[in-house]
């Protein structure tokens, strides 16, 4: 039983959610101001994808495991505090970048710093909240994704339009420093495995390279060699690959297709990619915890059903003739798709013991960062570039799109027909590239469906082995 009151645990989860909100905000701000950066620094969409995905994700993934292993032994609160101060400061420094190379380097630094957030946070939450409520608690934490996106979209869109993209980075970075100090003062380091069976809280032996390698192999085996868990991990990775690419370029699509300014696009992104997504995350976690009282299969079925329903809405968002219909469809697609996150994270935390949770989360975030975030925006940006070039060539243009429309805009003094050809080709290329990414959402749904077979047996086996406690009723005061 946890020694902390339900009220204090709620405060802890909310403070960790605030940290993840700034994590998401500092990551998302690039996609919101991407058109302004593209025009200012004369970049291609593939370079934008590199900035928003690969540069950040490569270092995020490489830094995740060492920091996670440190979090299994050292204070997770201290790790989060230092990491939050570092990535917030580096985000603000993006305003000083004068070239693509400089901005790329700073974003790589942000990636290293942000690697200290979620492994520590997931481990902390799992030591404050019992297994029967973890999907719900982790859903609240994961809402930081949508909250950060809302702030990035609303604030970044407004500042990009009225003060420039550089000021947007400053505004996104600085508040995180204050949040880090509050977390350091308010959040206590909980006992490892305090809400789990005794075997889950076993102490680690003294540090040795051999032991660390053995621990990494054990966690990897838990995620890879158990078929239902592997399907959950594959589904999460494929869905994130699609989502990172899709949501990175959807603000640009609204500007290109409907000729909207940064401010309105920011508000649309905040509502459709933030509020609706956040509600979906919360509902998915709470619903799966509730239905899992009868069958643990619902931890996979809720994402599978929600993902299936989301697909036609994502397609409709890209073929709707007006921005209002597109925004409404985008909101519904995000609501149903993102119901998958809480159940997936909750299941993973429940199949490893207390001294391996940060490491398990780090493995997940390697998939989410190096594969999904690292390649998703880059892939979608590359596909958009290819579709745009082919659309522009089909219009009968004598020169390539990049030569005629540097930065996506016709050269100064170009004829009206050339300006319209540039705009039309870019809008059509964006639509086709984003439609292609929806196919990866469908692929992920298939893995969630497959995960539902055998998930009952998997989770029951871990409960009997002492990796988790059985029912909510066996732990007093564990309600969020």
Model-predicted regions and their roles:
Residues 42, 75, 96-102, 130, ...:
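Helix-breaking motifs and short loop linkers at transmembrane-helix boundaries and internal kinks
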Residues 78-92, 299-314:
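Structural signature of the two symmetry-related core transmembrane helices
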